[in-house]
């Protein structure tokens, strides 16, 4: 995983971050197939709620590969970090 930084250094896709409504309260794909997940990631382009790479099905990453949407945000309580798949960098937004 890339370095965690206070400013989005190295991410050139900030213009794709939008205010979105989560598509589900859990991983929408796991809910559909009756699977489980470890942590949730919210696509900040379209609102797709997917599971993390530690989850068996890695639906957030699969969504990125299918859609090309590069930015996810942790949907875990108390976490406010983002990940850019294209630039492979984790970051938090200031302010």
Protein language model features and the residues they cover:
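Cys/His-rich, Zn2+-coordinating zinc-finger modules
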Residues: 7-17, 21-26, 33, 49-95
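Canonical RING-type zinc finger of E3 ubiquitin-protein ligases
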Residues: 35-44
